[in-house]
Amino acid sequence: MKAVGIDLGSREVKLVVMQEDRIVKRFKIGTMSFYRDYCTFQDKITVDMDKLGIKGAEAAISTGYGRNNTDLNIFTPINEVKAHVYGAICQSGLKDFILLDVGGQDVKVARVQNSILTDLELNDKCAASCGRYLENMASVLEMPLNKMTEYTKNPVELNSTCAVFSESELIGKIAEGASVESLCAGVNYSLYKRLQPLLTKFKGRRLVLAGGVAKGIALREFLKNDYDDIICLEDPQFNGAIGCCYLGRKRLLQEVDCDKMNYQKFISSLLKIY
């Protein structure tokens, strides 16, 4: 059984192919390049699967930012939250956890109990608690993003609640002579502080991190103050696409089970006749 999952982000499109219960292919393409080079536009957007090197998919599920953008021909669209919850279940093997997904321009916090989503908080209105904020700050500091997100010690205080004003505040701290290390730590701690209000109602022992920001060492260190067990998924950026594959495979298995049941009923009815 082969399933393909696609997560259409604002900056990148992530694709995953799952054969049986193994991921056999994963890759990402810039969003503009994806629509320009791999799609045609008629009544619906049609993805050129051959051009992507994907053949023989029996299930195709899509998710992403914006409902209309994910309505692709031959793909069944699902909402982002469901995709990321399924992805976290698939990657972690857990049934009970709090999921924190920090994407490029939104944040999702979900409570999962016995593999079922039971509570949810979203922030899709402000970039100050998202990955785009970290990218902008790294650009101001002229430092690679993965390097900036390592620092935790002696953070400078950054109080602005707006991503735009935060840049000006950071430049002011640079002018005051703050060290690069403390500036980086300040950026990381300010992200943590902005996430705290969303996390307040989600008390629990185990936190699963997804999204590109999950790779940052500093955020994981700060979150250890609030949770006993911090789990960073192996493929945090591909989590949504993996969740799509997981759901696609689950539906295929249900169809097979249904076919088997119908076949058994058919055989039983024949035996009764004869």
Sequence positions of predicted segments:
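Short glycine-rich, Thr/Ser-proximal phosphate-binding strand/loop in the N-terminal lobe
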Residues: 3-40, 117-126
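Short beta-strand-loop/turn "lid" adjacent to the catalytic site in phosphate-handling enzymes
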Residues: 31-34, 50-82, 92, 118-120, ...
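Glycine-rich phosphate-binding loops at beta-strand->alpha-helix junctions
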Residues: 65-66, 199, 203-226, 237-240
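Glycine-rich phosphate-binding loop plus the immediately following alpha-helix
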Residues: 114-154, 159-162, 246-250
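Adenine-nucleotide phosphate-binding core of ATP-dependent small-molecule kinases
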Residues: 163-203, 237
